[in-house]
Amino acid sequence: MLARKSIIPEEYVLARIAAENLRKPRIRDRLPKARFIAKSGACNLAHKNIREQGRFLQDIFTTLVDLKWRHTLVIFTMSFLCSWLLFAIMWWLVAFAHGDIYAYMEKGTMEKSGLESAVCVTNVRSFTSAFLFSIEVQVTIGFGGRMMTEECPLAITVLILQNIVGLIINAVMLGCIFMKTAQAHRRAETLIFSRHAVIAVRNGKLCFMFRVGDLRKSMIISASVRIQVVKKTTTPEGEVVPIHQQDIPVDNPIESNNIFLVAPLIICHVIDKRSPLYDISATDLANQDLEVIVILEGVVETTGITTQARTSYIAEEIQWGHRFVSIVTEEEGVYSVDYSKFGNTVRVAAPRCSARELDEKPSILIQTLQKSELSHQNSLRKRNSMRRNNSMRRNNSIRRNNSSLMVPKVQFMTPEGNQCPSES
């Protein structure tokens, strides 16, 4: 929830509140780290003080495609309206200069008096009729009520010019709309990443892992994954580099970053000597000011357009000692994927030390696994003993209930005064 602002201005703070603030200084909360790449893949970067704004107009098509939809639709509508109005003024000026307006005012209606062949454009009596004729020419509606004659060469020139301008506007604006609807990042909306990344032991090595999946049946061809670590560093000369990017390799048996994304995959990076995570332990991870950026690229199978999906993981989103649960099962000869468990993780045994310490002391991993096995056996014993105790309590309660439901013996008195027990 958003923090509510104080109703009382700062210059009118009550004395008691001010005294409490002096006696109990507030602990300043740690500000959240600014992400370089948002979880949605958008770049969290603000461009300021750009002096040469005219460079955007030199590539006007890309500028129009990059605009928001509401701005694009406004420009789309205004471009046609402005062109219609501009040429409506030109048609009205042609009719006014040739005297067609006065001719129609004198004759009233067009008759068989030679007026039809004496005007530049028939039935252009006012600016409204000129505007309608401009729309008919540019959109090629062709109602037939207004038509151009051979009387004015200038009108023929205006007709040719309007057709050329109309074709240019149609090509640019319709191409812009098409490119916006077919942009590559639209396909990236169905490429999903796990919300958290994990660090666990795989094949005797500490590994950084995350999960990626595709919701569509149409595949991504030549899909590749790149991972970069972005953090603030300081050079030996004292220069502070706020955004230092470093590529980290992806563990792949074929020594390539290409993947076959037919089902959700767990992408693994082995933390070795080349990795920037080599000296980071579980305790150090919480205090690290780093961001792991993941970039998935590929070609859309249906359109052939190259698409790119991005996400990032900061230190708070990396879970140490967890692994992803399995979500792919085989059902009736078909592999089924349960996306409800896409980001679910379970806790596993993992050393809390860094990968460097693990390489220097391999016994740490053995001790961790032994402790995990012992704790697992103890939990199983406790669970079995609890089940045994619950079973014994249940049996005792059943016996008590059965004993309370036993039918008592009934005795009858004979006329002679003797007791005769009845058979139950």
Curated annotation (Swiss-Prot):
Per the UniProt record, the site (Role in the control of polyamine-mediated channel gating and in the blocking by intracellular magnesium) maps to 170
Query: Where does the sequence pass through the membrane?
Result: 70-94, 155-176
A GO molecular function annotation here is: ATP binding
UniProt lists compositionally biased (Low complexity) regions at 387-404
Q: What ranges are annotated Cytoplasmic (topological domains)?
A: 1-69, 177-424
Tell me the residue ranges located in the Extracellular compartment per UniProt. 95-126, 146-154
Q: Where is this motif: Selectivity filter?
A: 140-145
| Intramembrane ranges, chain numbering | 127-138, 139-145
Pfam families given for it?
IRK, IRK_C
- Membrane topology, as annotated: Multi-pass membrane protein
Q: Where in the cell is it found?
A: Membrane
Statement: the UniProt record of this protein carries the keyword RNA-binding: no
InterPro entries in the record, alphabetically? Ig_E-set, IRK_C, K_chnl_inward-rec_Kir, K_chnl_inward-rec_Kir6.1, K_chnl_inward-rec_Kir_cyto, Kir_TM
Keyword Ribonucleoprotein assigned = no
Q: Which residues carry this modification: Phosphoserine?
A: 6
Its GO biological process annotations read: action potential; adaptive immune response; apoptotic process; atrioventricular node cell differentiation; blood vessel development; calcium ion transmembrane transport; CAMKK-AMPK signaling cascade; cardiac pacemaker cell differentiation
**Keywords assigned by UniProt?**
Ion channel, Ion transport, Membrane, Phosphoprotein, Potassium, Potassium transport, Transmembrane, Transmembrane helix, Transport, Voltage-gated channel
Q: Could you tell me what reaction this enzyme catalyses?
A: K(+)(in) = K(+)(out)
GO CC, sorted alphabetically, is: glutamatergic synapse; inward rectifying potassium channel; myofibril; presynapse; presynaptic active zone membrane; protein-containing complex; sarcolemma
Region annotation Disordered: residue ranges? 373-409
Subunit architecture:
Interacts with ABCC9.
| Function of the molecule | Inward rectifier potassium channels are characterized by a greater tendency to allow potassium to flow into the cell rather than out of it. Their voltage dependence is regulated by the concentration of extracellular potassium; as external potassium is raised, the voltage range of the channel opening shifts to more positive voltages. The inward rectification is mainly due to the blockage of outward current by internal magnesium. This channel is activated by internal ATP and can be blocked by external barium. Can form a sulfonylurea-sensitive but ATP-insensitive potassium channel with ABCC9.
Q: Which family does it belong to?
A: Belongs to the inward rectifier-type potassium channel (TC 1.A.2.1) family. KCNJ8 subfamily.
**Protein name from the UniProt record:** ATP-sensitive inward rectifier potassium channel 8
Q: Which organism is it from?
A: Mus musculus (Mouse)
